[in-house]
UniProtKB/Swiss-Prot annotation:
One of its GO terms (cellular component) is membrane. Belongs to the glycosyl hydrolase 33 family. The gene is nanH. It is an enzyme of class 3 (hydrolase). The keyword Translocase does not apply. This is Sialidase. Substrate binds at R37, R246, R309.
Length: 382
């Protein structure tokens, strides 16, 4: 039984414990965690829903004391078991942070695995674009955790991600695209990534992806999707990878037919959805419809044209004709300017059930909705 709507993480309503079992004292009422941001979600083959988010214990700020919280539901989003899945280093009580999760659920060598990737800092007190002197920045890291027990426990994966960024020589820091990655038809794992380039590179922010066959050894393509940056999602379509990117105003979309060496505009999705001033993260996935694919997308309409990022909505993209349809304004509210508008979609077709879920920011909380009722309309848009 799936609930239509529920609160996953409640602002000033959650208590967590640290690695030693001690209560983490936040600045929220009664010592609770103050604010939650940046939701990511995946649905497993068992129908389990796993949601990740920044647990911003003391303030909504990006530069603050942050852990990665995880919530797990086995009853379709009705109830949630919550904990900290990834702890920061506890080096700086004000600035140590792991943040901006991106997740994948995939079959890796015969075992269903959840991967979640987060950025890590300890001392930087400004936005990451302010640190472009070194490649990579010495305070930055990008870490990966996994679960092989349906989201019950998580452990760190020792990867070469930091090494490939160091070897590149032009990247100061790199983050996941935020939200979800994917497993390609050939089995490769793909995380969308956004990166800050060093000062000698004209464009500060670029996007791309990293890929792996085993979740341990990762590679970075030789090219970049340049000129547009910040949060992005990757989908697979007609032997290409398509990049959907946050932009101030109309969202941008580019495709690569040579696995990340070169990128060209992708007209069916490029400049189709307007997030207005400042832009906002969005979530883009594909849903099968017969022998075709439809892209489902969620992001804020941002009717006030500011950081309140109102009206988080669901869209369907016809990837062949380029038409786009607004399906549902599922959060028709004005957000909190301290942090608002982010969302993540998850589609799953299991033996007995087909689901479409969304999680999103709601005034410092993370909420869940079941959008499966829209699947017939979305699938007709092919």
């Amino acid at each position: 039984m799936t609930v239509e709507k529920s609160v996953v993480f409640k602002a000033e309503g959650e208590h967590f414990t640290d690695q030693k079992g001690n209560t983490i004292v936040g600045s929220g009422s009664g010592g609770t965690t103050k604010y939650f941001r940046i939701p990511a979600m995946c649905t497993t083959s068992k129908g389990t829903i796993v949601v990740f988010a920044d647990a911003r214990h003391n303030t909504a700020s990006d530069q603050s004391f942050i852990d990665t919280a995880a919530a797990r539901s086995t009853d379709g989003g009705k109830t949630w078991n919550k904990k900290i899945a990834i702890y920061n280093d506890r080096v700086n009580s004000k600035l140590s942070r792991v943040m901006d999760p991106t997740c994948i659920v995939a079959n890796i060598q015969g075992r269903e695995t959840i991967l979640v990737m987060v950025g890590k800092w300890n001392n930087n007190d400004k936005t990451w674009g302010a640190y472009r002197d070194k490649a990579p920045d010495t305070d930055w890291d990008l870490v990966l955790y996994k679960s092989t027990d349906d989201g019950v426990t998580f452990s760190k994966v020792e990867t070469n991600i930091h090494d490939i960024v160091t070897k590149n020589g032009t990247i100061s820091a790199m983050l996941g695209g935020v939200g979800s990655g994917l497993q390609l038809n050939d089995g490769k794992l793909v995380f969308p990534v956004q990166m800050v380039r060093t000062k000698n590179i004209t464009t500060v922010l670029n996007t791309s992806f990293i890929y792996s066959t085993d979740g341990i050894t990762w590679s970075l393509p030789s090219g970049y999707c340049e000129g547009f940056g910040s949060e992005n999602n990757i989908i697979e379509f007609n032997a290409s990878l398509v990049n959907n990117i946050r932009n101030s105003g109309l969202r941008r979309s580019f495709e690569t037919k040579d696995f990340g060496k070169t990128w060209t505009e992708f007209p069916p999705m490029d400049k189709k959805v307007d997030n207005r001033n400042h832009g906002v993260q969005g979530s883009t996935i594909t849903i099968p419809s017969g022998n075709k694919l439809v892209a489902a997308h969620s992001s804020a309409q941002n009717k006030n044209n500011d950081y309140t990022r109102s009206d988080i909505s669901l869209y369907a993209h016809n990837l062949y004709s380029g038409e786009v349809k607004l399906i549902d304004d599922f959060y028709p509210k004005v957000g909190n300017a301290s942090g608002a508008g982010y969302s993540c979609l998850s589609y799953r077709k299991n033996v007995d059930k087909e689901t479409l879920y969304v999680v999103y920011e709601a005034n410092g909380s993370i909420e869940f909705q079941d959008l499966s009722r829209h699947l017939p309309v979305i699938k007709s848009y092919n």
